[in-house]
UniProtKB/Swiss-Prot annotation:
Monomer. Coiled coil: none annotated. Its main location: cytoplasm. Pfam families: 7kD_DNA_binding. One of its GO terms (cellular component) is cytoplasm. Highly stable from pH 0 to pH 12. Belongs to the 7 kDa DNA-binding/endoribonuclease P2 family. Hyperthermostable. This is DNA-binding protein 7a. Can constrain negative DNA supercoils. May be involved in maintaining the integrity of the genome at high temperature. It comes from Saccharolobus islandicus (strain L.D.8.5 / Lassen #2).
Length: 64
């Protein structure tokens, strides 16, 4: 499976693309929420140029 690597509050993280719930664009950044498990929702962002193509495809699907 594809993973998204990002920094959140100075901490390096990575999340499996299948856990991502919602994706949106903020300028040249792609922001997203994901399921952390235990009923928690995590947040992350990655630059458009560093985003995996699967994340960009999710963004396009949500626009429709």
């Amino acid at each position: 499976m594809t993973t998204v690597k990002f920094k959140y509050k100075g901490e390096e993280k990575q999340v499996d693309i299948s856990k991502i719930k919602k994706v949106w664009r903020v300028g040249k950044m792609i922001s997203f929420t994901y399921d952390e498990g235990g009923g928690k929702t995590g947040r992350g962002a990655v630059s458009e140029k560093d985003a995996p193509k699967e994340l960009l495809q999710m963004l396009e699907k949500q626009k429709k």
